[in-house]
Each structure stands twice: as C-alpha cells, then as structure tokens.
Amino acid sequence: MPNVTVALLFGGKSSEHEISIISAKAVSAHIDRTTYTLFPLYISRDGRWFKGRTARKVLDLDITGLLKSRTIETTNRQLLAMTENRDEDLFDFNFQKEGIEVAFPVLHGAYGEDGKIQGLLEVFAIPYTGCNVQSSSMTMDKEITKLCAVQAGIHVADYMTVLRPDYLNNRSAIAETIKKRFAPPFFVKPANLGSSVGIAKIHSFDELENALDEACRLDVKILVEKAIEGREVEVAVLGNEHPIASVPGEIEPGGDFYDFTDKYIDGSARLHIPARVDADTSARLQEEGIKAFRALGCSGMSRIDFFVEKGSGRIILNEINSIPGFTSISMYPMLMEHAGIGFTELIDRLVRFALEKTPA
C-alpha cells in the first residue's frame, strides 16, 4: 500500500484544541513516510481549515511548552496570529484535487469525537480512522454511553442527568434533589466534553452551585455521578469486526482526580502498565472493554475507561473515548506499545482499518 496520502486533521473548535495539536505532532513524528504522504489540515478555533505552510507551522509549535509557561488564552492568541492573512492556505474541501485518500482525525472533544467530522468525511466519500458517525456521537454523550452499557450488562456508577434549561429555571429544586440522592464526594460533569474539561469533584454541598453553573456554561446536559472509590484503569481496544484489547493500564492521579492539568500540563499522575490488579481482574477488564466497544458500535480504536471498585472488585464503566489522546503521555499508544504494537505500526493499522471498513 505505497504512497497513500493521509490527511491529518487537528485543532478544531473544541476546548481540547491545543491537546489535538499535541496529538497531531506525535502522529506526524511517527507515521511511516515511506508508505504515507502526510497532508496536514489545521482547523482553527473559528472553524477555518488551513493546509500548506500554515498547517505545518502550527504543527511545529511547542504547544506543550506554551501551555506550561503561558495561559491558554495567550496560546490561543498566538495561534490566531498565525492564521491571519493566510487566505492562500485555506482548504477548499476538494479532497480529490489534493489526492487525499484517507483522513486521520485527531480532533478531541466537540466537532471531532461527536460524529460531526465523521459525517462530513462520509459526505465527501473519504475513508477515516476511528469510529463511524453513530458510534462517535453515542460515545461522546456520557449518558447515552451509560444507557447502552447497562443494556449490555456492564456496570455503571449511580448518576442522574440535569438539563441546562431545567436547572436554570429550577436551581433550588434540582440542587435539593441532588443533595438527597448523593452524598459527597460526587462528580458534576458536562455530558459531552472530554479530557476532564469542566469536571468538578464535590466534597461539600457548598461547592455544588458553582460546579453546576460552570458545567451548564459548557454543555446543555450535565451528569451528576457518584464517586467510585477504587482503581482508575483504562483498556485500549483496536480493530473492526475482530477487536483486540490491551492489558489494562492504571492511573494514579497526582491530585484529587485525573484532571486536565494532570493529564497534559504538569504530568504529575503516575501510570502503571500493567495495572496493579490480579490476573483474573485484568482478563475481565479486557473482556469488558471489548464488550463495551461492541455495545457502542465502535470501530478502529477506542480507549475504554473503568473503575475497579475497592472492596467489591466490581468493574464499573466510566467512559469511552473514540479518539483517545496520542500525546507522549497518553495511555492509548503506551498500552498498544506494551502489547507489542509500536506507534508507527499502530498508525499503519488504523489507516488499514479505515480503508477496509464497510461504510455505515
């Protein structure tokens, strides 16, 4: 399969814009250039698509360093300045003219993992890596994920859903309902964001109102969810009709929980591969990972996140990431590396799975 042109889609309109650039840098560094011709496509925060020199300049940025030394707002301004007066690099969506044969989206969060970019690529008949439109949109929504998981016999944490209009019209009543149902600690989460953006761990009911306000600012649907005491583990799943699951990896958060800063800025979390669980639990996690992958109709790749509850040993699904991080500290490529599938081979397999996948 020589000289296949792969469009690397990165950036995007979500709050995970910078993380997408970091993932794209890793893919660019590890893709086999003797087999694939890389065509970078940078999507700015305002939705403009850039190719050529502009896309390559963004890809060359040390985003990790910028995020550590500056605020996200300052980094955003620098990215915006790089796209000013660069109309000659605007992409006109003529994929065929550019010779693009397959797309490799590393667009995390909204507009990337929710089925939107997948739908656009299907309109243009461009094969793409990862899950299809339906499974992407389902796994993006934490409530839908839980509903499908329960139907498949997979355990989930106790939760309730709060819709933004209901909360804004009935703040006191909804807060009282939450207080009666959940005892601290528990979580307040936007239903459709990733990388722990907007998540708050509630230790006291005094923190509830601010957490709900912030989550409602970010999403129209909010989850209130019981905090599970136990190990936080992840399983990498790869494949289409016959997926394989890695051994589980374990996250030991540096702070109260595995938040955005822990994941991408200070890297204070400790990762254990394999997870510190017995052989039986490890095998069950792999089985549950594949079961969840199939229950949500996933294809190509997904990272399945679980808790192993302290005391009971119950395996509880947390969430599914249809486009997991590909950064140097991301669990998905590290788990695949442990399974004997290096980064370059992983990219190759994902492209091959994209080309063989039957259209939805």
From Swiss-Prot:
Binds 2 magnesium or manganese ions per subunit. Residues 146-352 form the ATP-grasp domain. One of its GO terms (molecular function) is D-alanine-D-alanine ligase activity. Mg(2+) 1 binds at D305, E319. Pathway: Cell wall biogenesis; peptidoglycan biosynthesis. Mg(2+) 2 binds at E319, N321. Its main location: cytoplasm. Its cofactor is Mg(2+); Mn(2+). PROSITE patterns: ATP_GRASP, DALA_DALA_LIGASE_1, DALA_DALA_LIGASE_2. Cell wall formation. This is D-alanine--D-alanine ligase.
